[in-house]
A protein has these predicted regions:
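Bacterial Sec-dependent N-terminal signal peptides
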Residues: 1, 5-33
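Acidic/polar, low-complexity intrinsically disordered N-terminal segments immediately downstream
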Residues: 21-73
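Loop/turn elements at helix/coil->beta-strand transitions in domains of secreted/extracellular proteins
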Residues: 29-32, 62-67, 151-156, 202-207, ...
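Short alpha-helical segments and helix-capping/turn motifs at coil-helix boundaries
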Residues: 40, 44-57, 136-148, 217-218, ...
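Extracytoplasmic/secreted cell-surface and envelope-processing proteins
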Residues: 42-47, 76-80, 165-169, 215-220, ...
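Short glycine/proline- and acidic residue-enriched helix-loop micro-motifs
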Residues: 120-129
């Protein structure tokens, strides 16, 4: 009887152990690219088109690679009415997921194939109930889920939606993302986004690419210095079509990503040189602390001249609307004006270390976005002021209370001068 009882208990122990076995997903070699698309807004169709061009870019890959897209679009979306993570894995021979290159090429060539059919070949890895995807906890959960779904040696991440740099969330402006209609206040704040990225990936993302307007400013880059190695962004508006992913995607998987930041930016400018407008910069976020110190040194050494710099004489990058006017000015031009006409060599050298590559369209289709190349450095920055209009009062208060660049770059120590 005892023998039978022993065998019974042993069997129970064996099966209970079987149930508790944890399968650890295999880590994939190389880099996986994540794309976080806030698409419940006027960019819905453009972001959907971006996924198709991303697929074309994956088809050009010579090695296997994975792209995971988080999509939070309109409830009426045919493909994905609910927020979800969608996976696209190329075999390095033009095939994606279970479909061969020939099959995908035929689908793309067939005029009867809809965009929904094309992007619908993605594997849905996880669905979510309706949620506000600009909330900090939601962003953290989703990006963590994306990384868990496809464990890799490293990651790069793309953010696609509306944007307006470091600005606080008010009617007409949004730091990054818009989850809802045109006037929705459901947007993400850059300090919160940076904290999310630091939390989910302490080893840092290889890059952050902002496919969103006006993210190319010192305030944004500085927040990301402990979250990403490199950042690609525009200080101007980005046309709705976004990045030319068909040509850019293969670069995003290269091991030595720093060597391909230039080609990524060049492809962007080449794409818009004759059909749009734009600026683009690739920034080494590891150099942002040094840049903050360089700016701080100049500001503190020239405090008496702060009041003499007229921002009306500077190139400002909030060109698309009066709501954005003054959000960022050219950093190099400002420092030069502050120093009496010429920026110090040590500052200029640090700026060159920080901005690895930058360019702009020389003949934009809209004169609104024409750039003064003689006063363009690829790095925007906010210049606080004593204006008492509601816009600037809100901006200055948020700048002082929430943006780390304010304290790092010398503005906090000189408030008694510029704030009066």
């Amino acid at each position: 009887m005892k023998k039978i009882l022993f065998l019974f208990l042993a069997a129970c122990f064996f099966f209970s152990c079987e149930k508790e076995t944890i399968v650890i997903p295999q880590q994939h070699a190389g880099r996986t690219v994540l794309a976080f698309f806030w698409a419940d807004n006027s960019l819905n169709s453009s972001l959907r088109d971006n996924i198709q061009t991303m697929m074309q870019g994956l088809q050009a890959m010579k090695d296997s690679a994975a792209l995971l897209v988080y999509w939070d679009g309109e409830a009426s979306d045919i493909s994905w009415p609910e927020p979800c993570i969608v996976e696209y894995v190329t075999n390095g021979q033009g095939g994606i997921n279970s479909l061969s290159k020939g099959t995908i090429d035929a689908m793309m060539a067939d005029k009867n194939t809809s965009i929904y059919d094309l992007i619908g070949i993605g594997n849905i890895r996880k669905k979510y109930p309706p949620q506000t995807s600009t909330e900090k906890t939601v962003m953290q959960t989703v990006i963590g889920d994306m990384m868990s779904a496809y464990p890799s040696e490293s990651y790069g991440i793309i953010f696609g939606s509306h944007g307006s740099g470091w600005l606080p969330t008010i009617t007409g402006t949004r730091s990054i993302g818009q989850d809802g209609g045109r006037y929705s206040s459901d947007t993400a704040l850059i300090p919160e986004l940076a904290e999310v990225l630091r939390t989910v990936n302490p080893q840092k993302f290889d890059f952050v690419l902002f496919d969103a307007c006006m993210m190319g400013c010192a305030e944004v880059y500085y927040e990301l210095k402990d979250a990403a190695r490199y950042c690609i962004a525009s200080v101007l508006d980005i046309p709705a079509a976004g990045f030319p992913y068909a040509s850019v995607m293969p670069y995003l998987y290269e091991n030595a990503i720093k060597d391909y930041l230039g080609p990524i930016c060049k492809d962007y400018i080449d794409y818009y040189n004759y059909i749009g407008w734009g600026t683009i910069s690739a920034v080494d976020c590891n150099q942002m602390e040094g840049l903050a110190e360089a700016v701080r040194s100049v500001i503190l050494s020239n405090q008496d001249s702060l009041k003499n710099v007229d921002t009306a004489d500077l190139q400002q990058y909030g060109k698309g609307s009066s709501s954005f006017k003054g959000y960022a000015y050219d950093m190099l031009q400002f420092i030069g004006k502050l120093c009496g006409g010429m920026a110090p060599d040590d500052f200029t050298q640090q700026l060159k270390k920080t901005v690895i590559y930058t360019d702009y369209t020389h003949d934009p289709t809209s004169s609104l976005y024409r750039i003064d190349g003689d006063n363009y450095s690829g790095m925007g920055m906010y210049i606080p002021n004593s204006f008492t209009t509601p816009k600037y009062l809100l901006w200055n208060n948020y700048f002082k209370s929430s943006i780390a660049w304010y304290h790092a770059s010398g503005w906090a120590e000189t408030e008694s001068i510029w704030g009066n």
